[in-house]
Amino acid sequence: MKVTFLGHAVVLIEGKKNIIIDPFISGNPVCPVKLEDLPKIDYILVTHGHGDHLGDAVEIAKKNDATVISNYEICHYLGKKGVKTHAMHIGGSYLFDFGRVKMTPAVHGSGILDGDSMIYGGNPSGFLITIEGKKIYHAGDTGLTREMELLAEENVDVAFLPIGGNFVMDVEDAVRAAVMIKPKKVVPMHYGTWELIFADVELFKKKVEEKGVECVILEPGESLEL
């Protein structure tokens, strides 16, 4: 199974089924691919309604007849646009044909900007994905939260954590999160897309590895095998 970081918070999982998380491709200044470069996508996971995460979900879903997995409010919004959806809520889990997905808490917003209006997008979340015997945690956009301690029992293989500050955890809080989660590997995300969320990723790697957690820095387009 290949897991590819496509910049910002976009993660592509290629296995028996292909899954993309927070598909912000168009307009993403650090994404190295275009929509037409993506493989066939079976499922799209959306952590919250902000444009840099909801991204190109509608176009990708319609092109591939893919199913969007997100909270009820986002799924309702997308369903009105003719998209296939599977609605969940925080704490809920479901066994799909590729594996199990559990929605985890996140501390953030989730409004959907639609023209001049901001539509209620439910609660933001992360995802704990169990697939082909491996566990992947994608935190979404979030501040540090005590609920992350519960993930230590999950034996997470790789955790994608935001480190860019301002809207999400900064380096120091992301290190604390990694210590609580205890993943085998941590991959930093949601940094450097714009100047406002610049972070010293090498400092994060140094500090988190001092705490005993292996850090893998993936440049946009780079992958790891699980």
Curated annotation (Swiss-Prot):
Pfam family, one: Lactamase_B_2
UniProt keywords, alphabetically: Hydrolase
Record's keyword annotation contains Cell membrane: no
GO MF, one annotated term: hydrolase activity
Signal sequence, renumbered to the chain: none
Gene3D superfamilies membership: Ribonuclease Z/Hydroxyacylglutathione hydrolase-like
Disulfide pairings: none
Family: Belongs to the UPF0173 family.
Protein name: UPF0173 metal-dependent hydrolase TRQ2_1653
Species of origin: Thermotoga sp. (strain RQ2)
Lineage: Bacteria, Thermotogati, Thermotogota, Thermotogae, Thermotogales
